[in-house]
């Protein structure tokens, strides 16, 4: 016998579809916060465990990035599963803890192989950008508890960085033959943790849910007009 489960009731994740003879499954250590709509017809991005540099790892369904004692100038890197090809795309990342600097932004392919191509917003207010305008300093700083927004326009090749729903700066990335991805890193040998939110599941609590213009995704802050959750 099989089981038909729609997962359409967040208060009863173990519910078996009505009309079948089987009872519901019990759930353990699961709440409504541990689930999100993500189906073959609309798949949201997550972190890509196959495209990271050790000792960084993804947890929480590949949405929480944890790096401990990264080595070298730029620590351990990560990228999302869906490339930013065409259109306008948005994600959030909540800074959880760090003993060094956070860096969140966009990069083509694997960041360690493209140091001269990425565009990142660091927690000390510095922007590291290989594109037009280059590196800049003196922007708004951020720390644990802050939510950084990244909104990428593939046609214009620009990225809007925001902090807690307020735009900080718009940067033009360098033209690149490979598509960009959302991603991030810490700095040097620091320890840092961040929770990504591409619109699907995220491990941090969202107090005032916002969606994109198509009604997709769940974000703490509304995406800029015309930008969408990173999903299929």
Whereabouts are the PLM-identified features?
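PRY/SPRY (B30.2) beta-sandwich protein-interaction domains
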Residues: 1-232
């Amino acid at each position: 016998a099989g089981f038909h489960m729609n997962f359409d009731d967040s208060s009863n994740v173990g519910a078996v579809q009505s009309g079948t003879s089987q009872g519901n499954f019990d759930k353990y250590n699961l709440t409504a916060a541990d689930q999100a709509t993500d189906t073959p017809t609309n798949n949201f991005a997550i972190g890509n465990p196959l495209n990271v540099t050790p000792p960084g790892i993804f947890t929480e369904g590949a949405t929480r990035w944890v790096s401990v004692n990264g080595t070298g100038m730029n620590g351990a890197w990560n990228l999302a599963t869906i490339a930013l090809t065409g259109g306008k795309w948005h994600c959030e990342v909540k800074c959880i803890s760090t003993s060094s600097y956070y860096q969140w932004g966009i990069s083509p392919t694997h960041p360690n192989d493209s140091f001269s191509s990425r565009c990142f917003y660091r927690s000390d207010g510095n922007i590291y950008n290989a594109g037009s305008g280059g590196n800049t300093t003196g922007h708004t700083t951020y720390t644990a508890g802050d939510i950084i927004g990244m909104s990428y326009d593939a046609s214009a090749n620009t990225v809007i960085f925001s902090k807690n729903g307020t735009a900080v700066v718009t940067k033009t990335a360098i033209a690149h033959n490979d598509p960009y991805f959302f991603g991030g890193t810490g700095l040097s040998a620091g320890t840092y943790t961040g929770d990504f939110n591409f619109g699907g599941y995220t491990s941090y609590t969202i107090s005032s849910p916002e969606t994109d213009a198509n009604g997709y995704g769940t974000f703490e802050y509304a995406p800029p007009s015309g930008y969408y959750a990173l999903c299929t």
